[in-house]
C-alpha cells in the first residue's frame, strides 16, 4: 500500500498588506486643493507653506499650485510647500 507520512505544520505563511506609503506628487507637479502629496508614518517630511498635516501624518495641499520640496533648518528637515499658481 503506497503511503506518505503527513508533513509537519508550520508557523509561517502570513504577511501584512502593503500600505502604499510614499510621495504621491513630486516636485514641480501641479496639484489642486485637497490633493495628497505624501503618505507617511510619522513626519519624515514636514508641512510647509499651504500644506496641511492629517491625523495619520498625511501631507495634503491646501491651495492649488506647484509642489516644492526643500531641506532647511538646523536639523536639515525635509519640508514640502505649495507655490500658488
UniProtKB/Swiss-Prot annotation:
Which residues lie within the region annotated Disordered? 1-26
Pfam families from the UniProt entry? Ribosomal_L27
Keyword entries, A-Z: Ribonucleoprotein, Ribosomal protein
Q: What PROSITE patterns does the entry give?
A: RIBOSOMAL_L27
Q: What GO terms describe the biological role, i.e. biological process, of this protein?
A: translation
The GO cellular component terms are: cytosolic large ribosomal subunit
Source organism's superkingdom? Answer: Bacteria
* Tagged with keyword Ribosomal protein: yes
Q: Does the keyword Glycoprotein apply?
A: no
| InterPro entries documented for this protein | Ribosomal_bL27 (IPR001684), Ribosomal_bL27_CS (IPR018261)
Family matches, as SUPFAM superfamilies: Ribosomal L27 protein-like (SSF110324)
Q: Name one GO molecular function term.
A: structural constituent of ribosome
For this chain, the family text in UniProt reads:
Belongs to the bacterial ribosomal protein bL27 family.
This one is known as Large ribosomal subunit protein bL27
The organism's taxonomy opens as:
Bacteria, Pseudomonadati, Pseudomonadota, Gammaproteobacteria, Cellvibrionales
Amino acid at each position: 500500500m503506497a503511503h506518505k507520512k503527513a508533513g509537519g505544520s508550520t508557523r509561517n505563511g502570513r504577511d501584512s498588506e502593503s500600505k502604499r506609503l510614499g510621495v504621491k506628487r513630486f516636485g514641480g507637479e501641479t496639484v489642486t486643493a485637497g490633493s495628497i502629496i505624501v503618505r507617511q508614518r510619522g513626519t519624515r517630511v514636514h508641512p510647509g507653506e499651504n500644506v496641511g498635516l492629517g491625523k495619520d501624518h498625511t501631507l495634503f495641499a491646501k491651495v492649488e499650485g506647484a509642489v516644492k520640496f526643500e531641506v532647511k533648518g538646523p536639523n536639515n528637515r525635509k519640508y514640502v510647500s505649495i507655490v500658488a499658481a
